Amino acid sequence: MDTYGSIKRDLKYMYDVEEVFRNTIPKTYFGIDDVEDLHVDEAGISNIHNNITLGTKKCYHLYKKGHRTQVPIYLGSLVTRESNEYEDVSYSYDNLNTIYKDAPVWEPLLNKVSKWYDEGWSVPSSKPIPYDPNYSKCLILSPDKYKKYHKVVVDVDYDAFHWSIDVNSEFMDMPNVIRAWDISTIPQFVDGFPMLKHLIDRSKKEALFYFNYRLIPYVVHNIDKDDDMWREWLSYFLHGDHFKPDRGSYDNFGSLLGHKRLEVALMYHNRIRLMPMSATALDAMNEGAKFLMKDPTYHTAVMKKYNGVLTQYGMAEPLGYNRGWGYTGVTTADSPFILSNVNGADGYTVIDREAVEEAKEIGMQYTPKLVKLQLANMTKTSSPVNLIDSLIGNAIISLTGFAGSEKVSTALDQFEKENFERKVPDELFTAISNVTYEMVRESFQPLERSMLDKRTRLLRLYNAGTSASSSAPPGARYIFNKKMIMYSTFLSKSIDVTDEYAPMSFITSLNFNNKTANILTHPQNYYMYDWHDNHNRIINSGSREVRGGRATRIITPDPPSNYMLLILGALNTVRDMGSHRTGFSNLGMNEVVGSSFLDAVSHDALAPQCLATSSSRSLCAQALDYSTWDRQQGGRIAEAKAHGIMRVANELFPNTNTNLSDVHNLLELPMSSILYLWSESIKSSYKYKIDHSTVAVDAVRSGELTTQFSNHVTNLAALRQYHETYNRTKVPQGFRPIEVAQINIVGDDVNVILRTADRKPFTLRDMEGYHNHTFEKAAEYEFSISKKRSMMSNVATEHIKQYFKMGDILLDVMLSSMTSERNTFREQGYMNGINLLYDIAVTIMARYAQNDKLFEDMMANLPFMEGVVYRHGSQKYHFHPSPCHLLGSGSPEILPSAIDLRTFARVITVLGDYESDLYEAMSSLNATLLSTSGTTQFESQVRKHLSEELGDNIISPVWSEVFYRDEVGYEMVTKHNKLTPEGHREYLVDRIISTLSNREKLIMNNADIIEKLLSGKLKKVKRYFQEIKFKMSNMPITGLPDRKIEGVSELSSPYRAADVGMRRVHKCIGLSRRNLKFPSVTERLSRLLKSYGLVTQADSAKILSAAAGLGRSSTRYRNLGTDLGLSDMHASSFAQRLPALLTQYEIENASGSFTFYDTVSRTYDVSEASMNERVGDVSNNPIARANSSTSTYYRFRGMLHCLYGARFGLSLHASVE
């Protein structure tokens, strides 16, 4: 294959995309017809007024000449316009006039529709949904009645309380889910209660719709009057159900959920563009979208009642088997999969027929096409289309995006205690205690891990500031109200400055209510442990939304000092849970794999699930689904965990008397006392503020450090009991002995691989006997476990939204790049947004979408991004970078035909001078777009305000006990005072300031970016490596050979529904096992400084930045080392090691050379062995140096060429010409 010919075609395609983009941008800003090319080389900041007509609607295409060829290179388009001013517009159609009066932002769409009407087009009106009077009967309006009704409510703010919802009311189904009721049918008041206002407020809070693009232009340019789904939406919108959008907030004039109906239409079109589904599935998707559009959030909740059961049984009892993975390889440390190319033997699934029948009966009333598809899919065999079809129900319920539920009622449902005292038999109590003991005791091996002096404890707290596992206390925060922040702009720097274009300013409130800031200013809030205060304090709760109609999740963080307690007593345990390496010998060792894996990908970490659902019939998988697991962890179960912790304390540490009524200094408390306080905190309840209520939570708290550990312990203990009692009680009754081969537990999610003791195939009777015993035992323990959502099978299984069907892996399909949970996407800056969209794209690629479709979708959506936005008075400036900026460093650096190969695009520089100019121009553009000069301005002014109001008192003096120099009277040699122990206070002030909101920083950064663009002063980027040409030759495939199904060859990758190019790489090169790692230079420096025993407040990136400015001088490097606090011996070693680190630092800053692995590429075999096999000696390249990072770099670039060829089905070898 001529890879370079393909690369040239990719580049030609990018030029075509760029041309379409350049023509599209002005059309997305309605009324802008004036377009002009502007060559920024010739502009200069002093001539901006002469080059830009301020205050007019115009689009400037910006160009800059390449320094080699002097050919102008398109940078992007700058749109200038005034803020929206709407004039009176009159239409010949009353409905359009009504919409314009309420929401004039829709004028471009209304103009379009008016022309359609003129041409004879029409759309019928959809029937609105009237208000249900029974809703008022579901409201609790008396705070006293409300408090009495809910046992977990310990207090009510009588002034704030106006209403609550009875979730289990007999009068109405799911009253806590907001409905799409016609606003005109909702009474203003019901018995004095302001019903209309109440429901409108609910819709704004609960029915979220944060679109990642500019909504109106996106709709106008993508709408099709003849498309069935667009017509469905227009049947609502044009007949009264319109709304006014305003950056995530919506004023509805028809129904309460007009905006969610539009979201369904947008998400539907995105799904059908990207998902290669069957015609039957497309019909089901169309049917489901129309059903959801009628009443988006409620109908999503209705679909959840039947979709889950029918989805999990997809391909559960197929009529044929065509997959077989070899047992060899999965039980060793070798390649995870050996394809047998044999038909799988018959397998079985324990199916809850009653649950299937119930789901069928419900679903046939609403989405019969979907239900028929799902029922038919149960007997189908695995294929790419069938796999995707099996998850169409999930894809449908995700069309409503983030649709939560009423917060207080959700919280009460989440935390409400059962009406009985849970029975915890001694055998379960002992099992929970044993698991807790094992995990905690192991975390203190060797015992030195528990030896924490005061300095080490404070250092743990310092490094824990970025975690979200605790709340900041309500007091001890600095709030500076109404501080003036000035920022100069390209306007104010122009020659003739009038008042209209004077320097800008804004008034902002600076709120330091942030955990990092609080730790640095008031660490005593964390290390002074007051049991009485913790349990009487009212803690603010949080919340998050989840796709697919699931209820709002309430987050309950720890009190600050309890957080500190856990990072001292439990941090090792939590870390150990998350640091298991996958091992295929698990199948022989009965090893329990913890909550997560190092470097894990599905085919590696969960290979036994693939094996158990394909050819090895002596294995099967059992997946259990617990309901409200968190709230089942209180009472005697919590006591069992506390008992296990105290067994460790009593065994390993001297006994101490710890009084709960005392206030304890955690910096000095012995480990036995810390474990005692941890054990007591597990058994106790905490109070959380949720709107108008204070709720007591005595179960596992969702925002604490040990949430997953605590859920894991009970899950594992119960699982052991299910298994042990089965073999003890059921085997004597004639059932076969069963062994546990592997357990995967993540909190309340469990998937266990079971094996017959005699290694003979499972029968259906074996599975049913074991599965039924599990539920009998769970009922005995009074665990709430859903039988209809649990399954036992050696054909299909599921673990944490990863589906395994006949050995194939299918990942969840709910992810989308169209909407976000919060408005943060638009507030994070353009380049961060681009990188996030890219990450989502490659994740979807590994699940169901094809490369070409994904790239086309990204390019089609690019003109509708916000771009770099800057406002000055009534004027707005929008800069939209060229699509070619995705080729340059600082972006993913991708080519259209291989978006999974991050950084590969720099290969274009070997094609010629123009291509080199293009790469450098796009890299400079990206560096400019990533500029943080505005942030620097902002933070320097904030620092001045802090100094004026607080002087030197902002940082707690306790940090001087952590960051100090042993040597007395040391005199600094370099100028980098903030990095030294003596300068730690200044450094920590900077760290506090960095926690402030991004909004002000973004405003100032954008002003600076547009100034640099218009002046032609883009940031220069050094290319550390020059790309070289490789000679490509054919070699035998080393990956998974094709399998034959009914005589037809087919790719055999386990990711069978994923992008075909990805699967070809698995064939030609192979699946990943232990890929080559490229540790970042900051990671390497951190390890080096730690080996020297240095305790410093400075992060490695800032140290490297300081060193880079010293010039290549070993004396200066040694001086920097001593300034940091190193001994003379270590400073000399530091000076010797630093040049190599600085080389890598320059490489990473210049080109991000070693940033490669993403969701897709992580599955490719890029191991040392694979590279040795596929890439020849690069040392004969004059640019490379043996045994250096340059050699590694060029070997990796050669491997990228091999991966690129493999995407097209070619197994290649790369050598240097």
Swiss-Prot record:
Task: List UniProt keywords, sorted A-Z.
Answer: Hydrolase, Nucleotide-binding, Nucleotidyltransferase, RNA-directed RNA polymerase, Transferase, Viral RNA replication, Virion
User: GO terms for CC?
Assistant: virion component
The UniProt catalytic activity note for this protein reads:
RNA(n) + a ribonucleoside 5'-triphosphate = RNA(n+1) + diphosphate
Q: Which residues cross the membrane?
A: none
Report the EC number(s), separated by commas if there are several: 2.7.7.48
Q: What class of enzyme is it?
A: transferase
For molecular function, the Gene Ontology terms on record are: hydrolase activity; nucleotide binding; RNA-directed RNA polymerase activity
Compartments in which it is found: Virion
- Tell whether Mitochondrion is among the UniProt keywords: no
Q: Tell me, what does this protein do in biology?
A: RNA-directed RNA polymerase that is involved in transcription and genome replication. Following infection, it catalyzes the synthesis of fully conservative plus strands. After core assembly, which consists in recruitment of one capped plus-strand for each genomic segments and polymerase complexes, the polymerase switches mode and catalyzes the synthesis of complementary minus-strands.
- What does the similarity note say? Belongs to the reoviridae RNA-directed RNA polymerase family.
Per its record, how is this protein called by name?
A: RNA-directed RNA polymerase
Q: Which organism is it from?
A: Eriocheir sinensis reovirus (isolate China/905)
